[in-house]
């Protein structure tokens, strides 16, 4: 059995022993005492993190794909029931020398839910990639994704295995002219109908079998990749051809699809993550625990809105923010599991019906003897008067002309006004609305944590969109006396993502403080530490971010003594 772990495992155990040796006698161990368990935990975390990154990018690519297909020229459009899909994965394997490697797999194909048309698939005797609308789309989408979205994976020197699958129907072939576009072939290895074969084809003899026709369709895709995809010109590529002749006739049996494996794509990243784990740099790993259900008066609503409808971009890592914060609420702050509700990709109505209404019922049932926490990670926007609004998932901008895009990417320079601005804001949640929902119910405390930008910039630092302003300066909203709001940034500044940590910067540093204080930290200490550490790290990355707070008018300095643990 091969070793599934990485080379630093013995160093890891030495570090573990050193930590245990110097730890106070009453402290909980920070790591498992078993080397095997410790290595398993690290390995599991690394693979999970890599898959998380891959899945996030896959979602964004598929959003872009659908938008690009919509904007194809009429002559190249696919049927409404033809669906192109990119699937990506992280796969552990071994090299020919028996060494472990962590590979990236890019798979693009399409499904057809109709059988009456011929334009999407190859004409009966055709083999060139551009004679099939579906093959043309797959080739061009592959080029766009590899060259524009996956440049950090398809890097110089990496080995790839490119499997091209091409098929024919059962129509009998007597003779098809071959023009020699891809050269003459003698005894070339391929798989045909699940058997290893050797295929020959040249201009003199032409095409006389379905095996030859399917093979040339695959060679056509290869010719496109070699000529058009720049990233593949710097990798070491091995091509495999899988061909098939179906036993029925029809255009939907004449197809091509593509799978690319980038060998060792994540090996370096895995080593870097392992080193960081040894230094306890990840808040998602080794989450501390206190007595279960000890914080029984606290209830929390977590809103993690990561996925948005195209052409709006997703909010990077918002889902992970919500999931990990849930772990800290339950394990580190001792909030009972049933007291925490997580909403993923929730729209305005769902947030109210499933979240706010749930909290209001609890407050009434407990006669206000509860502490309320509401967390939001997602997009935000300011109205013409700079009032901040949360922008939930599911927001529909399809009827707004400014959002029309040819390549699936959000157009730059969008500034909405008038009816278009009103259409967007009507689907959002203003701070006044959010806090006003609790106007008729009183709790011991309300704490809001908002990790969002309101200035027209995404977490990634890329341009989002804006609403034309009627005033020149941002002014923080006023809230009632029992409310404290932690904000990742003021309404005219950007809340960024911390890419290496898979979190928003603000959320990451809140989690870090909860981790190393084990939840025993006041709001004042939390805010001071987050401000200092976040400003330092974000400035090193060239994207300075400073959090802010909004405090109820009559709280004065008393807010600073609040904590998340309320026994």
Q: Across the structure, where does each feature detected by a protein language model lie?
A:
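Acidic/histidine-rich, surface-exposed loop or edge segments in extracytoplasmic proteins
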Residues: 102-129, 201-203, 300-311, 336-338
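Cysteine endopeptidase catalytic domains of the caspase/legumain-like
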Residues: 29-31, 272-567
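A solvent-exposed, charged loop/short amphipathic helix patch at secondary-structure junctions
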Residues: 119-130, 176-209, 391-422
């Amino acid at each position: 059995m091969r070793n599934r772990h990485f080379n630093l495992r013995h160093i890891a155990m030495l570090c573990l022993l050193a930590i245990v040796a110097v730890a106070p006698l009453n402290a909980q161990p920070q790591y498992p005492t078993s080397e095997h368990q410790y290595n398993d935990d690290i390995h599991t975390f690394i693979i999970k993190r890599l898959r998380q990154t891959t899945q996030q990018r896959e979602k964004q690519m598929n959003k872009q794909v659908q938008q690009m297909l919509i904007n194809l020229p009429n002559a190249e459009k696919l049927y409404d029931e033809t669906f192109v899909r990119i699937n990506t994965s992280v796969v552990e394997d071994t090299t020919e020398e028996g060494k472990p490697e962590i590979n990236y797999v890019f798979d693009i194909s399409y499904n057809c839910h109709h059988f009456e048309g011929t334009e999407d698939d190859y004409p009966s005797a055709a083999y060139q990639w551009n004679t099939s609308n579906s093959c043309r789309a797959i080739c061009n989408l592959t080029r766009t994704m590899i060259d524009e979205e996956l440049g950090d994976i398809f890097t110089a020197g990496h080995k790839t295995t490119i499997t091209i699958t091409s098929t024919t129907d059962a129509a009998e072939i007597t003779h098809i002219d071959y023009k020699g576009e891809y050269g003459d072939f003698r005894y070339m290895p391929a798989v045909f109908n699940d058997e290893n074969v050797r295929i020959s084809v040249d201009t003199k003899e032409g095409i006389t079998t379905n095996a030859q026709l399917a093979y040339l369709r695959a060679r056509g895709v290869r010719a496109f990749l070699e000529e058009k995809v720049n990233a593949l010109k710097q990798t070491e590529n091995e091509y495999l051809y899988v061909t098939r002749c179906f036993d029925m006739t029809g255009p939907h049996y004449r197809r091509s699809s593509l799978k690319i494996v980038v060998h060792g794509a994540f090996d370096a990243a895995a080593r870097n993550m392992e080193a960081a784990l040894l230094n306890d740099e990840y808040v998602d790993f080794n989450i501390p625990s206190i007595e279960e259900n000890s914080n029984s008066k606290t209830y929390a609503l977590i809103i993690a809105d990561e996925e948005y409808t195209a052409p709006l971009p997703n909010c990077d890592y918002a889902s992970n923010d919500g999931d990990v914060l849930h772990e800290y609420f339950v394990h580190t702050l001792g909030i009972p599991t049933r007291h925490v509700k997580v909403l993923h990709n929730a729209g305005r109505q769902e947030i109210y019906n499933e979240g706010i209404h749930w909290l209001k019922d609890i407050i009434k049932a407990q006669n206000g003897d509860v502490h309320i926490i509401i967390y939001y990670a997602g997009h935000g926007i300011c109205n013409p008067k700079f009032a901040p609004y949360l922008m939930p998932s599911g927001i529909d901008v399809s009827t707004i002309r400014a959002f029309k895009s040819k390549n699936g990417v959000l157009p730059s320079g969008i500034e909405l006004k008038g009816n278009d601005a009103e259409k967007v804001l009507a689907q959002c949640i203003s701070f006044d609305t959010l806090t006003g929902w609790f106007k008729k119910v009183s709790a011991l405390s309300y704490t809001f944590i908002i990790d969002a930008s309101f200035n027209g910039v995404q977490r990634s630092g890329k341009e989002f969109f804006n609403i034309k302003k009627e005033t020149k300066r941002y002014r923080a909203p006023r809230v009632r006396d029992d409310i404290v709001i932690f904000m990742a940034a003021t309404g005219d500044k950007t809340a960024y993502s911390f890419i290496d940590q898979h979190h928003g910067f603000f959320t990451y540093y809140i989690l870090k403080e909860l981790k190393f204080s084990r939840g025993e930290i006041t709001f004042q200490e939390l805010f001071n530490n987050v401000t200092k550490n976040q400003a330092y790290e974000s400035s090193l990355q060239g994207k300075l971010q400073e959090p802010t707070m909004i405090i109820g008018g009559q709280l004065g300095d008393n807010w600073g003594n609040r904590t998340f643990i309320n026994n």
